[in-house]
Regions:
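Amphipathic alpha-helical and helix-coil boundary elements used as assembly
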Residues: 1-453
């Protein structure tokens, strides 16, 4: 609950009305709760009552009250219960009201509700208020004993014989005293049947407007992404809100097993951030975070002609959209980047350490060419956790060139040219423990100097 734009008296007065508690000033004391003892004053029409009238009304008292509890995503509901009253006039008015207004209206609870028992209690209070509003007594008299919160018994003289008829006991809910300069006195009062436990009083609820606030805590104990904030008017008293939710452009859960939580955009404001606070139903007791605000100490804008859009985390990881260059850049604080250039069609990935690509199957396709450049290039592995079984290099023309040396090593080595095989070099050496050369039909060797030994 929140005291908002109201004095302490008005705040307590509003709470007493919302929770169905008595709160009144009897002329000498400020009373909270129904007094344990109430003075009863007898008033006789024609003696100390000069005028009197009864008013009975029917009203839509058939209602369903609801309240949403976000912590467990549950809508609590309750229908207004029947009222046990000893007043025959109140019973008649309620019966006629239910007959006329058969279809229940639906309305949100006037207070914040935590569980079903509190919802049922609130519904009982609302029904009690409706019952008390159906019957009203107005009277003018001259008894100074008529005070706010007292009970009065109304009596009328019998018509055919001496004595008085009792016309019921009433609770004084409003009284005005008038004293003239000549010493004459009178009062006017309003009263309801004393059988009513709840006074039919409704206090105006303040209408909350959007507020600026600073985030004090974002470590939600329930892990729901909520924050605690401090509005500007709470700073001098070091107050803060309860855990409140944060509005985001997209939020929900998955419709299947893939995503059960945090579907959408998850951006929880950081401690110290300035945020804008809104209120459900304009109720100061139901705040939530609209969004975050830049201010003069931290804002730099979107550059010339607002061409730069970006998202940056507190660690410095940044996604930048540059409409001037038509590029998208993902970068970290240490210079690791993924750069997409729409104009040239180029995508560049840069890292100051290493880049790893892991997958069950990987395909690299270049419609024109693929270049792999490095001082040292290794393809495959002979040992380790995942040794390479097969390496295939295929193409219409395959060239392997070493500026200084080129080596091919294996337990079994086969070099095959289906049409022609040529070994060529300035000097050719072959050393083997055993060599066998077979020519199917012909072997020709020629040299200016041939030595076979």
């Amino acid at each position: 609950m929140c005291q908002y734009g109201e004095s302490s008296f008005d705040f307590i007065n509003r709470l007493s009305a919302e929770y169905g508690e008595w709160f009144f000033y009897d002329g000498s004391d400020l009373c909270f709760g129904r007094p344990s003892k109430q003075e009863n004053v007898e008033l006789v029409y024609g003696s100390n009552i000069s005028s009197m009238n009864y008013a009975m009304q029917i009203l839509p008292s058939n209602a369903d009250i609801y309240s949403y509890k976000s912590s467990d995503d549950n809508v609590l509901m309750a229908s207004l219960p029947s009222v046990d009253t000893t007043s025959s006039l109140t019973k008649t008015a309620l019966k006629r009201s239910d007959e006329l207004y058969r279809k229940p209206i639906k309305q949100p609870a006037a207070i914040r509700i935590s569980d079903q028992s509190q919802m049922d209690a609130h519904a009982k209070v609302q029904k009690g208020k409706d019952a008390a509003r159906t019957m009203l007594l107005k009277a003018t008299g001259d008894s100074p004993k008529v005070l706010l919160g007292n009970n009065v018994t109304i009596k009328l003289s019998k018509l055919s014989k001496p004595g008085f008829d009792d016309h019921g006991e009433y609770l004084v809910t409003n009284v005005s005293h008038f004293l003239t300069g000549t010493g004459s006195y009178k009062n006017t009062m309003e009263a309801i049947p004393s059988a009513n436990e709840i006074i039919p009083f409704t206090a105006a609820k303040p209408v909350a407007q959007t507020q600026m606030a600073v985030v004090l805590n974002n470590n939600d104990p329930k892990g729901m992404g909520r924050v605690q904030v401090q509005m500007l008017w709470q700073q001098d008293t070091h107050q803060k809100t309860d855990w409140i939710r944060v509005m985001t452009p997209d939020a929900g859960g998955g419709k299947g097993k893939d995503v059960s939580k945090n579907r959408g955009q998850v951006f929880v404001p950081e401690v110290g951030d300035q945020v804008l606070i809104g209120f459900r139903y304009n109720d100061p007791s139901r705040p939530f975070v609209f969004g975050s605000l830049f201010h003069g100490s931290i804002a730099s804008g979107g550059g010339k002609q607002n061409e730069i859009k970006s998202m940056t985390t507190k660690a410095g990881s940044t996604l930048i959209f540059n409409d001037t260059d038509h590029t998208v850049r993902l970068q970290t604080s240490k210079g690791n980047t993924v750069h997409v250039n729409e104009k040239s069609g180029a995508i560049t990935i840069s890292s100051g350490s290493s880049i790893s690509i892991n997958s069950k199957n990987i395909s690299i396709n270049g419609s024109e060419s693929i270049n792999i450049l490095s001082p040292k290039i290794t393809i495959g592995s002979l040992g380790g956790e995942h040794p390479t079984d097969t390496v295939d290099v295929m193409g219409k023309a395959v060239t392997v060139e070493g500026e200084d040396t080129a080596g091919v090593k294996s337990k079994a080595l086969t070099l095959e040219g289906t049409d022609e095989y040529t070994d060529k070099g300035g000097k050719y050496s072959a050393e083997m423990s055993e060599m066998q050369i077979n020519g199917g039909s012909k072997i020709a060797m020629s040299s200016s100097d041939t030595d076979i030994s």
